[in-house]
Amino acid sequence: MKKALFLVGLVFTAGVISSCGGVSSQRTYEGAAVGAAVGAAAGVLLDKENRWRGGVIGAALGAILGGTITEIAQRAAKEAAQNNKPVVYRAEDGSQMVRAEPVEKRGNCTLVKTKYYQNGKLVKVEEKEVCE
């Protein structure tokens, strides 16, 4: 019974991840892959009873979180470049925040600085060019 429920959950998770394919970019897939790798490693280390289960669950959750954060950051950067003003996305619980701010216009492209916050602390800053 546990195996059947696990397989159903795994198939459901795979379906959810693959259904996002219409709007995803290469960077979203890369974010999901990194999230899956980190999640799998954490799951293996944390689930001492069944390391395979921990790895699979960690990979699934990590892929979803990594892909989602990457997609949100890309959307924020694109909106900031198009509207020429800062854009902020926050998680409902306030634990995560992405802030994208246009820095400089270069022809058809805009340099956007994206800051990632976790629990109110700055964890990452990146600059990227967003072109029309």
UniProtKB/Swiss-Prot annotation:
Subcellular location as annotated: Cell membrane
Residues with lipidation of kind N-palmitoyl cysteine: C20
One Pfam family here: Gly-zipper_YMGG
Keywords: Cell membrane, Lipoprotein, Membrane, Palmitate, Signal
Name used for this protein in its record: Uncharacterized lipoprotein aq_615
Lipid attachment residues per UniProt (S-diacylglycerol cysteine): C20
Keyword Lipoprotein: yes
Signal peptide: 1-19
Predominant cellular place of this UniProt entry's protein: membrane
Topology within the bilayer: Lipid-anchor
One GO cellular component, as annotated: plasma membrane
